[in-house]
């Protein structure tokens, strides 16, 4: 999925990225249940292509909704269903990808080619981004960090702040920059302006911050209207460079007297591979907290340590036994 996403941008075409989740999940699941039968794997992939991608309308205003929270799970569910169906003897639909009239690329990609942006190795898994500190869409994570750092300078000067400027990369502008009316929490956690306004005012962002019932909601709504988002071409360039993969944002304040605040720049948000050492203790803390409904902290800590000690060649049952027995 990651390698396909690096080579083919579905969101630029108006489709949701979970289509590649479906393709990848279906391929792997078909391999598992068929003991590597190439005919069944191919049939699964082609049946998924026949399904086509879903629109990403539910990720953008004014149609943002909770579907974006279950879209990936839905894609995996459908992938498993298609894999099971593809065990049955059926056509392989071998022309689905390239057919010049009714083929997938012709219909959905306007004859552009779907391709891998990276070889199928461990690069993607080694570069996974962990959402550690803030419940915010990842293109805005470093902006939230920068805003939290700038909060101490902003708060005593909020009444004389004329403008808040965010310098960001092009994908962030395309995907999460939204100053229009935000209809619900799903809208707000995909608004760069909203999350930055929250971080400046409160020095933090939590899931409660996105609710209309949140105590600071009205002030956040007023402040986000002062925010200007501009592209920093360097940030866009380094976003796409494989050896960097920055997700950079800068924030500064323009005051009414013409002066400016310090510009705060965060190039790699916490959870990025470049900041793994900082992230691991926080990931553990998040794991313990999020499993507290099921396990006592001591038990959860034992599970964490056992998972960390797993080796790549360990039997899968060992992982299951850890979850059962701790």
Language-model-derived ranges and their functions:
Residues 1-77, 81, 96, 100-101:
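Glycine-rich, mobile lid/loop segments that gate access to catalytic sites or pores
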């Amino acid at each position: 999925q990651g390698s396909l996403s690096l080579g083919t941008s579905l969101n630029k075409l108006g489709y949701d990225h979970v289509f590649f989740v479906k393709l990848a999940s279906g391929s792997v699941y078909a391999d598992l249940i068929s003991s590597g039968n190439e005919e069944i794997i191919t049939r699964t992939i082609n049946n998924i292509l026949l399904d086509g991608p879903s629109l990403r309308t539910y990720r953008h205003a004014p149609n943002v909704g909770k579907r974006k929270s279950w879209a990936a799970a839905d894609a995996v569910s459908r992938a498993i269903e298609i894999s099971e169906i593809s065990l049955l003897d059926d056509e392989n639909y071998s022309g689905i990808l390239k057919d010049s009239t009714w083929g997938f690329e012709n219909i959905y990609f306007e004859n552009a080619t779907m391709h891998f942006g990276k070889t199928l190795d461990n690069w993607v898994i080694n570069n996974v981004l962990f959402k550690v500190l803030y419940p915010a869409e990842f293109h805005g994570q470093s902006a939230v960090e920068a805003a939290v750092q700038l909060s101490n300078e902003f708060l005593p000067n909020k009444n004389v702040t004329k403008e808040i400027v965010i310098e960001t990369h092009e994908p962030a502008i395309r995907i999460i920059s939204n100053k229009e009316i935000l209809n619900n929490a799903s809208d707000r956690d995909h608004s760069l302006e909203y999350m930055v306004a929250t971080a400046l005012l409160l020095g933090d962002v939590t899931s409660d911050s996105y609710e209309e019932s949140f105590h600071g909601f009205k002030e956040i709504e007023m402040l986000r209207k002062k925010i200007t988002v501009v592209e920093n071409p360097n940030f866009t360039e380094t976003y796409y460079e494989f050896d960097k993969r920055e997700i950079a944002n800068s924030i500064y304040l323009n005051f009414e007297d013409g002066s400016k605040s310090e510009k705060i720049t965060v190039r790699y948000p916490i959870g990025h591979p470049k900041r793994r050492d900082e992230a691991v203790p926080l990931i553990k803390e998040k794991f313990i907290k999020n499993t507290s409904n099921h396990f006592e902290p001591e038990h959860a800590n034992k599970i964490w340590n056992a998972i960390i000690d797993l080796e790549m060649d360990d039997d899968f049952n060992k992982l299951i036994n850890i979850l059962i027995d701790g």
